[in-house]
Amino acid sequence: MHEFRAHQLNHFDLPGRIQRLGELAYNLWWTWTPSAEALFSRIDSTAWDQSGHNPILFLRGVENDRLQAAAQNLDYVDLYDRLCSAFGSYLKAGDTWFKRNYPDFENQPIAYFSSEFGLHETLPMYAGGLGILAGDHLKESSDLGIPLVAMGFIYTHGYFSQHISEDGWQDSHRFSLKFEDLPVMPLLDENGEPMTVSVELPGRILHARLWEIHVGRVPLYLLDSNVDSNNEADRALTARLYSADMDLRIAQEMLLGIGGVRALRMLGYNPVVWHMNEGHSAFLGLEQARELVQAGQSLDAAYEKVKAHSIFTTHTPVPAGNDEFPLWLVDRYFSNFWSELGLDQEGFIDLAGREHPNGQPTFSMPVLALRFSGQANGVSELHGKVARKMWSFLWPEIKEEDIKISYITNGVHTSTWLARRMGSLYTKYLGKEWRDHLDNQAMWERVLEIPDEELWRVRRHLKRKMVAFIRERARRQWIHHGVHPVQVIASGVMLDPYALTIGFARRFATYKRANLILRDLDRLIDLLNRPTRPVQIIFAGKAHPSDEPGKMLIQEVYRAVKKAENGGRLAFLEDYDIHLARYMVQGVDVWLNTPRRPMEASGTSGQKAALNGAINFSVLDGWWREGYNGSNGWAIGEDRDYDNPDLQDQADAESLYDSLENQIIPLYYQERSSDGLPGEWIGRMKESMRTISPRYNMHRMVKDYVERLYLPALNSKPILHEFKPVSPELLR
């Protein structure tokens, strides 16, 4: 495994007996290790909550007498010793899955680039599922012992904080992160000065300093352009995610791709595999080719070498969702770069140029990534098919089904998303070592042995816990923000911990159709308010600040939530983040997902919910098209695509209401057995857990990346061909 380059100074005033709390605070291992959070919360639970579960702020601010009391508490010290021992063993482990199976490659670095990483609520460096997946990928790579090193950005303002106004409009509040208050460490040179990397921009040099996060055994390096030597505009390059400003965006992606390669070189890494998580980092292929050409290799040889060791994962099933830059902008930013590749302007543009029937030609980042990758993949079976069709123009001589864009279906990091009580139940019935065998189907068959009453008891506890959390959240809004009483009700203060509860939480993009269930609002209200069979629905999610249709969708949903006829059975929870997501995926009974097929590349929130005993109710798109077996959840609509979106919406809405009214609600409220248990519901819950948990976890997913993509790239020998950019005619 890699050595960390930044070493945290223990600047906390801690009793000697519990001195290693400072070390634990600076490694995110504690965030996914059972009982590790208790090392902080048991010192002072109120202060822990007030810190936002930030161990750096907590240890800096907690009263000294609380620390002294913990250091003298025998039970606490026993827990501390056990977890410190486990942490030390984890970091030094020589017997990892990767080392056992592939010992020849344990010192061959794999570089993983992503524009966002969702690791914990204290690090708001993510906008949605792409970042959460990247964060889970790092955690599982650490668990499996993959020699991964990651590169991304640390954003000065993080992602925005969301507030919903009385009329339902999303207000975006920016805040500045204080990096010294986060579990991130600056990289310093031998003189104690910040290490920086530079990238040439038009008429100036962009500088970025480097930070490091310890994700278990995996180092994550983060680029930060907010340094004094940059002009004001360049200092803002890493201020926030996904700017709509094209000038800023191309400079940002140059920093990630080109600057990221240079940063790894400066730190002494020589990755053998380069993995691009989406196209934002595709310039890394150009930088590696430039290095090789400047070292004396031909462009042909450089291109083949870079391609042989590069992997591109695409997550976007629609062309409009991919980054493309106008040619004049590329000309402006790369006019001094292409000569270092031995290319002229036309040859450089042909690397990734695209013609558009009714518009100006562009420079496509996914095209660049595909051309410089020996292997590419989508993130579900259906998405792989969609991606092969979308990018088939790049390989006109190959049949669509033979195009080498494979798929690896997404999964989730089990220990991050699993409720503690559910984890204890798994330990009791699956075995003490169950977390080491997450992809073992035979082990998961033991779910059927869990007594119904024990499983139901845990499920009821998790829902009560979620409802209590939501109510307390609403109470704080009332006290601290003076919101209108109707907004307090809309925030979930009237939720019933014993009613059938449906969750819908995700980024509010229009294709995700959060309003599909509201299409016939009168019918829905009737279903919600039947006295003996109450139903409640909890919505949560953010729209990108520049996504006006997404914000209008939130407003439509919020206005429906506020209607008095709902009786408080609809709720919208503002400021959705990882912390709220954990409560929801652990607490709801049914997880609803309504994307317009085939636009959901994969999705993972339903996988998290299934792990905790919720049952999926979803359109047959993304991962659910593979996961659904007819008895482990419910499908919305048919396994088909529509040419007419209005017909699709109508058909899917009718299917949704029909299943809800005639299958889901009756099954939950069926006549209970003498012990008060809904036996058939629990049976479907167990079938969901048994079939989904072993397949749709990050343990299986990262192993798939290793065996199907990383190892072939590690073993790859470049085959020299004459370098021929794609003909512009084929890019139209």
Predicted regions and their residues:
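Catalytic cores of carbohydrate-active enzymes across secretory and cytosolic contexts
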Residues: 1-732
